[in-house]
């Protein structure tokens, strides 16, 4: 791929790569631009007071000390103290440089890392939904229902991949069918509003299930999202089955909207643990039908492939790709990179 001309120097190797979630933190180290990353055991965030402590624990299992770090985290990156969503850690890059002996630290949004990953994702690490398997060499989009609903674009321009983070998970989600109109009054809202994330995430699955039960006039019997999906996939609970069917339908609607926003002719990718667990439901007709139901642009949506990312460490693979060849990506680093 032709490279962009960047005046900014690449981060020095070895580079620590980190994907920081609310529950788990995953680290690896990349020694140089040609070596495979060495992965460390998954770290539970609750077991460490600070991220620096967690990094020290990971590095205690390696003879290699990193000169720099690229970390992906949930939430916006602002200022010199960056609190994590759903975790008590606060990332302080200047302190990290001083305490861990690093020269350079770059912090980006977690879905930017997911967007970086889909730039070069191989066929073995994706499951295609629908009949279209290959898209154009063009912009892409990624969505991920998890703790929340992450959304990012990956714009292809000037011979490079440019990740575009945002808060697309908070777009409005409204009823369209008669059944939707009966269910919607029972959904929990935030300040009277129902966003996509209110339905399309782990707690959103619970929200939808409880609303369906209230609509049907029955007491909910399932508590956890995993229980709902398990009963739905096993076809042992009618309300759970409808919950999952509507979940993938609404995800298809939102994915289609995001595809239009980014003109994602290169494909739309669904990532995260939930999507992998409900893959059989996503491969049923409802997801693609909702994705394509975007008159007057139905023909356009029919031409756009959709995939579920099955790579177990997708974010780390995206960060590694950037670490090896930063000039191939148009990643904005202003206000997010700290040097000694």
UniProtKB/Swiss-Prot annotation:
One of its GO terms (molecular function) is glucokinase activity. Its EC number is 2.7.1.2. It is found in: Cytoplasm. ATP binds at residues 18-23. Pfam families: Glucokinase (PF02685). It catalyses: D-glucose + ATP = D-glucose 6-phosphate + ADP + H(+). Its main location: cytoplasm. It comes from the Bacteria. InterPro entries: ATPase_NBD, Bacterial_glucokinase, Glucokinase. The keyword Cell inner membrane does not apply. One of its GO terms (biological process) is glycolytic process. The keyword Electron transport does not apply. Keywords: ATP-binding, Cytoplasm, Glycolysis, Kinase, Nucleotide-binding, Transferase. One of its GO terms (cellular component) is cytosol. Belongs to the bacterial glucokinase family. This is Glucokinase. The lineage of its organism: Bacteria, Pseudomonadati, Pseudomonadota, Alphaproteobacteria, Hyphomicrobiales.
